[in-house]
Every structure is written in structure tokens, then in C-alpha cells.
């Protein structure tokens, strides 16, 4: 059995493997939060969809000199928010892995940016931050005087035609997984992309791994936002 999905799917594959059914897992989740691999199928497509949607929102944000507060997916991981925020030039990015203070990380940052002459702003918020983006927009408007609007992108992020990167990586992982199964029914493995190479791990080992956010990338986002 080839199982495509995230942690929940892999736990199911583990249980099947324990019952003697050869299984190979392929990481497929837009959150990119599978610890054993650098890249999960679906992530790049979702990231590009977010970028396209935010670019459209930015058109009116710029023309009306507003602040747009945009919630993107990512319940436990901020990879989408962080990379999308960098790609669209967000003023502030809030992700669940890093503690934040609205006054310090949003309001003060906007005020500093205003002093440079900027009159439009994008705030990207991962859903896992548990921030009410509508209330945040009201707070921003009250404290900065900048007209603010909120948008929850929702399930539009989950659909769409896969990017070339997703298609190529899915093909490589699928090919690798089938070869593993054909090698004397070798199962109980998870396929992973590590530094552009396709490798595999024991499924129990993979489930026990923990993935952390790239703090250096977060610093880049902070440095280029003003």
C-alpha cells in the first residue's frame, strides 16, 4: 500500500505495517510539517496560490492606501505564512512557532514603516496563531489611523493545478515508493525529500521526528520588511 498524506495517514500506515501489510508513506500536506523531509507534496502549489491571491489583494491595498490583514493556512506550522510573507513583501508575519506581541510585532513595525513614507501594508497571519484577523484589523486601524481590512483565504488554498515542482517531486517520490514495495515487499518506510535527494526512513523513526521552523529565514523576513 502506498499511503499519501501527513502524520495521521502515516500512523495508519504504521498500524497496517504492524499487521504485516507492506506500506510506504509519501508526504503529502500543504503545511510542509513532516519532520523527516524538507518538502511535502502540495506545499509549493499552495504557496504559489497564496502568493497569487495576496498579490491581487495588494492591488487594492496599494491603491486605497490600506492595511490588509490576511489569514493563511497552517494550524501547527508557519511555513506557508513565513514564505508567502517574504514573497509578497509583508510588513509583519505571525506564525505559531514564534511568540509574538501585537503591539511590538505589528503596530510598532507599521509605525516605523510609516516613517519611511510607506502608506500600504500587508500583515500575514498563520491560522495556528489563533488571532481573530477581523479584530486585529480593527486594532490596527484604531492605533495607526490606517484603514484596515481582513481576509481569510480559506479553502481556495487547497485547490488548483499543481505547480511543476509539485508534479516533479510527486513523480520522483511515487517512483521511489513503488520500487521499495517491489523489492521483496519492503514496507514500513516513509519516502522523503532531503536536500533534493529522495531517501527513506523507518516509519516509526519518521513519526518520532520533530520539525522546527528556520529561524534564519524568519530573521530575513524581519530585516527586509521595513
Which functions belong to the PLM regions below?
Residues 4, 15, 22, 42-147, ...:
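Accessory alpha-helical/coil subdomains and C-terminal extensions
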Residues 9-13, 31-35, 76-80, 200:
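Short, well-ordered, mixed-charge alpha-helical segments that flank or form enzyme active sites
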Residues 11, 79, 83, 168, ...:
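A broad detector of short, well-ordered amphipathic alpha-helices
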Residues 26-39, 62-63:
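Acidic/polar active-site rim loop that often engages polyanionic ligands
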Residues 132, 138-226:
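C-terminal non-catalytic interaction/assembly regions of soluble proteins
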Amino acid at each position: 500500500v502506498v499511503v499519501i498524506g501527513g502524520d495521521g495517514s502515516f500512523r495508519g500506515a504504521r498500524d497496517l505495517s504492524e499487521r504485516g501489510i507492506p506500506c510506504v508513506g509519501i508526504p503529502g500536506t500543504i503545511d510542509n510539517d513532516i519532520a523527516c523531509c524538507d518538502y511535502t507534496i502540495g506545499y509549493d502549489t499552495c504557496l504559489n496560490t497564496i502568493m497569487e491571491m495576496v498579490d491581487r489583494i495588494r492591488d487594492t491595498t496599494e491603491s486605497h492606501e490600506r492595511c490588509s490583514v490576511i489569514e493563511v493556512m497552517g494550524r501547527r506550522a508557519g511555513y506557508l505564512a513565513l514564505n508567502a510573507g517574504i514573497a509578497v513583501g509583508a510588513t509583519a508575519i505571525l506564525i505559531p512557532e514564534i511568540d509574538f506581541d501585537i503591539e511590538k510585532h505589528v503596530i510598532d513595525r507599521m509605525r516605523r514603516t510609516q516613517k519611511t513614507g510607506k502608506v500600504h501594508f500587508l500583515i500575514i497571519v498563520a491560522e495556528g496563531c489563533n488571532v481573530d484577523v477581523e479584530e486585529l484589523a480593527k486594532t490596527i486601524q484604531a492605533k495607526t489611523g490606517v484603514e484596515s481590512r481582513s481576509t481569510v483565504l480559506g479553502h481556495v488554498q487547497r485547490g488548483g493545478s499543481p505547480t511543476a515542482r509539485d508534479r516533479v517531486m510527486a513523480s520522483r517520490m511515487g517512483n521511489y515508493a513503488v520500487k521499495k514495495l517491489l523489492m521483496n515487499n519492503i514496507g514500513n518506510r516513509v519516502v522523503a525529500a532531503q536536500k533534493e535527494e529522495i531517501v527513506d526512513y523507518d516509519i516509526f523513526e519518521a513519526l518520532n521526528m520533530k520539525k522546527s521552523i528556520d529561524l534564519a529565514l524568519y530573521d530575513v523576513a524581519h530585516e527586509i520588511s521595513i
